[in-house]
Amino acid sequence: QAKIDQERFKWLEYYKVKFKGTWYTNIVDKLVLRSQAEFGFLGAYNQDRGTVPFERFFVGGDGLGSFSLDGREVVQLRGYPNQSLSTTDGNTVFNKFSLEVRYPITLKQLASIYALGFVEGGAAYDGFREYNPFSIKRSAGAGLRIFMPAFGLLGIDFGYGFDPILGGNERNGWQTHFIIGQQF
């Protein structure tokens, strides 16, 4: 068994395709709508060997604290705990949709502060046979961002997950997410 696995992973042959589109629309005065769609797929060149266990997608949470050595890619979805919407080994397909309304409180040189409200939906799948872009986990919430040139982007979000996480029956409820130097 160990010899077979060594041969299987001797040469990692895979491809990873990701699409991400972000659109900003000025609604009224300083109010801005940010809409975003993401999609990712991990495939194998040699179907006999299957998909590699590395570079898989893990959906859920804010992405902080995802220290791993297997090259996993964390897809942030507020309102849920980190990596809670994927299987233990990760998934090969994901999609995510989000709408965010932003309003600047101050746009000074030393610190830009803005408030936001969001709705998001996303999911992870084990392949295209399971893929259904309308079967997603949904969340909504509000947050605050501050950008300071000395520190970068800092923020806090309060998200409510409307759907149960994998293996659960109840709604997820409220989650607090901290943002440090990254864009949601």
Predicted regions and their residues:
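C-terminal outer-membrane beta-barrel translocator/porin domains of Gram-negative envelope proteins
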Residues: 1-105, 117-118, 125-127, 166-169, ...
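C-terminal beta-signal and terminal closure region of outer-membrane beta-barrel proteins
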Residues: 60-69, 129-184
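Repeated loop/turn-to-beta-strand initiation elements of outer-membrane beta-barrel proteins
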Residues: 28-33, 106-109, 146-156
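Hydrophobic alpha-helical bundle architecture
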Residues: 100-108, 131-132, 145
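Active/binding-pocket-proximal capping segment
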Residues: 37-41, 113-124, 133-137, 159-162
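Glycine-centered secondary-structure boundary/capping sites
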Residues: 61, 110-112
